[in-house]
Regions:
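Glycine-rich, mobile lid/loop segments that gate access to catalytic sites or pores
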Residues: 1-77
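Catalytic/RNA-binding core of pseudouridine synthases
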Residues: 42, 167-168
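Glycine-rich anion/phosphate-binding loop at the beta-strand->alpha-helix junction
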Residues: 55-167
Length: 168
């Protein structure tokens, strides 16, 4: 059968996001940040060093891409593929948000901007975009499935914070 591939990468470190249009699978495992955009690595090194020196921490966004996934996985109700992916991602400790495709950013788009137009090229169906993240109506569309999740900054930091104990 057709082979599929799943790959993940860190696409944002604190306030510094990378250009996911510059995604390069080969770069991901060749840097300590698992960043797919080579141009961000030095910036992230400096940024994280400053965060660490200040005694603080930062969050991150991890994007997962699945290629070669057959059309038709999932269901329109109850067993939606995007629901299952979001549930699995939310079960990871420290995850505070999940996006499928354009996710939260789709709220800023018009219907025309967000819709993934389909056209025929030869005998194959193609899409002009992938805002839906490869899932339409809970069912895989045959496009690359793209999902991301946000991880909160660790609360184990060196800076003084107000808290309470059993005495108040």
């Amino acid at each position: 059968g057709k082979k599929f591939k799943v790959i993940g990468a860190v696409t944002q470190l604190g306030i510094l996001g990378c250009d996911t249009n510059q995604w390069n699978d080969k770069v991901i495992t060749k840097n300590p940040f698992f960043c797919p955009d080579k141009s961000m690595i030095k910036l992230w090194e400096k940024y994280l060093l400053n965060i660490r020196k200040s005694g603080s921490s930062c969050g991150a966004v991890i994007e997962v891409r699945a290629r070669g996934i057959p059309t038709g996985l999932g269901a329109p109700i109850y067993s939606k593929l995007d629901m299952d992916i979001a549930s699995a991602m939310m079960s990871i400790n420290a995850v505070k948000g999940v996006n499928i495709g354009s996710g939260m950013n789709s709220a800023q788009l018009s219907g025309e901007q967000n819709s993934d137009e389909i056209f025929q090229k030869g005998k194959k169906l193609k899409f002009n975009s992938n805002n839906a993240g490869g899932i339409l109506g809970g069912i895989s569309s045959g496009q690359e499935i793209i999902a991301s999740f946000a991880v909160k900054p660790t609360s184990s930091i060196l800076t003084t914070r107000k808290t309470i104990n059993k005495f108040g």
